[in-house]
Design a protein with these regions (language model features):
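Acidic, low-complexity cytosolic segments
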Residues: 1-24, 33-165
Length: 165
């Protein structure tokens, strides 16, 4: 789980990016596992977008590897009404941007790469800090039920038998 201050810093970066590129309609930071880290995606389901980003990332990574072009850096999809651009963001995350079809693609790449690097720095630093911190010891669980005090059992010499009564 990302600390609140780091989450706020990632969200600030996404909002600044949308200010620098006015044709952006959404921005999402997600883990490569498809889980949302932070988003500013009005009108788009962030969980669905993160899952689709992870799926397309898997294909892009394999394609780059199969063609001998090295590790994943970015992916651009052009649709009839706009663009979806995904950039590497550190070791374990990606930045996905949604843009109108009239966006300057060069500007989109320039700002997307910078923002991806910044988001990656924030997330990698938070991950490194989490690894340095000693793990919190879980609290001792409380018993589900308490034991009642047991009464002493009678011994064979104390118990009357059917023949003695």
């Amino acid at each position: 789980m990302l600390p609140e201050s780091d989450l706020a810093a990632v969200l600030d970066e996404l909002r600044r990016l949308r200010t620098r590129v006015p044709q952006l309609t959404g921005a999402l930071a997600a883990g490569v596992d498809g889980l949302v880290v932070a988003h500013d995606t009005p009108g788009v389901d962030p969980d669905g977008l993160a899952a689709l980003t992870a799926a397309s990332l898997g294909v892009a990574v394999r394609l780059a590897d199969a063609t001998g072009n090295g590790g994943f850096r970015e992916l651009l999809v052009r649709g009839e009404r706009g663009y979806v651009a995904t950039y590497a963001a550190g070791r374990t995350a990606v930045l996905t941007l949604l843009a109108q079809d009239r966006v300057n693609v060069g500007r989109l790449h320039l700002e997307g790469r910078r923002a991806g690097a910044r988001v990656g720095e924030l997330l990698d630093a938070a991950e490194a800090e989490a690894r340095r911190r000693p793990p919190e010891r879980p609290a001792r669980p409380t018993p589900a039920r308490t034991r009642a005090t047991r009464t002493a059992r009678a011994t064979a010499t104390e118990t009357p038998t059917a023949t003695e009564s």
